[in-house]
């Protein structure tokens, strides 16, 4: 499938992949478009990041990032995941985590963004505190580029709801590149979802319910 064509380059996506599994191909496609339109060097940056990501995961199951994903997965277990973010970058990551947990692990996950969470959702933790502790887990996706007020909001959120629900803070900061941080967080989330699928004994590739819905919508 050709996504972009110009005198400079063509980008093709490998056939047969589900969209979530084509993340790398699609990221490359968008980067090539931006490079042509804005005369930038995103593709070169991606090549550098690709080597970095390969190194992170070169030890497979024994890699530090996979071990971290297993720790997070063990904390999640059968709980509903609520993911909070506070910057544009962490919003992208939290959205990816949500959909990967939904699709790969067939588990419930939802997202909220600071400061919006403080205008409404923060109150939802006041009722049924025992049920919240038993059935939910909150994940903070942190970003080294957070505004000081967002940092403060995260700390206050932890203080206000920490006794009502377990909280995991994911704070991966790469001083060299925001892109490296973003893709490392994406990799971590993907591994969390796959390890959670294994723990819950579900097939990450199965999308029967979505296919059934498509058929029903088609009449």
Predicted segments, located by residue:
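Phosphate/pyrophosphate-binding betaalpha-module
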Residues: 10-51, 55
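Single conserved hydrophobic/aromatic residue that forms the stacking wall/gate
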Residues: 1-12
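Hydrophobic/aromatic beta-strand patches that form the interior of the parallel beta-sheet core
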Residues: 13, 82-84, 110, 137-141, ...
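Active-site phosphate/pyrophosphate-binding segments
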Residues: 36-135, 216-219
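A short, charged, Gly/Pro-tolerant segment at domain boundaries
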Residues: 207-219
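Short helix-capping/linker segments at secondary-structure and domain boundaries
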Residues: 33-43, 106, 193-206
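C-terminal active-site/capping subdomain that shapes the small-molecule cofactor and substrate pocket
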Residues: 123-208
């Amino acid at each position: 499938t050709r996504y972009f064509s110009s005198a400079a380059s063509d980008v093709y996506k490998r056939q047969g992949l589900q969209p979530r599994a084509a993340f790398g191909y699609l990221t490359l496609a968008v980067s090539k478009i931006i490079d042509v339109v804005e005369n930038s060097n995103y593709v070169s940056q991606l090549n550098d990041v690709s080597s970095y990501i390969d190194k992170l995961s070169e030890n497979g199951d024994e890699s530090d990032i996979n071990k971290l994903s297993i720790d997070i997965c063990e904390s999640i277990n059968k709980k509903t995941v609520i993911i909070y973010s506070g910057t544009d970058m962490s919003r992208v990551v939290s959205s990816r985590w949500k959909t990967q947990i939904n699709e790969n692990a067939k588990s419930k996950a939802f997202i909220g963004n600071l400061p919006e969470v403080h205008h409404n959702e923060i109150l939802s933790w006041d009722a049924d505190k025992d049920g919240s502790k038993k059935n939910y887990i909150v994940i903070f996706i942190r970003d080294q580029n957070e505004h000081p007020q967002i940092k403060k909001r995260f700390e206050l959120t932890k203080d206000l709801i920490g006794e009502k629900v377990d909280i995991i803070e994911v704070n991966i900061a790469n001083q060299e590149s925001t892109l490296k941080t973003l893709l490392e967080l994406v990799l971590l989330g993907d591994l969390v979802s796959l390890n959670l699928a294994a723990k819950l004994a579900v097939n990450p590739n199965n999308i029967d319910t979505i296919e059934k819905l498509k058929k029903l919508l088609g009449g």
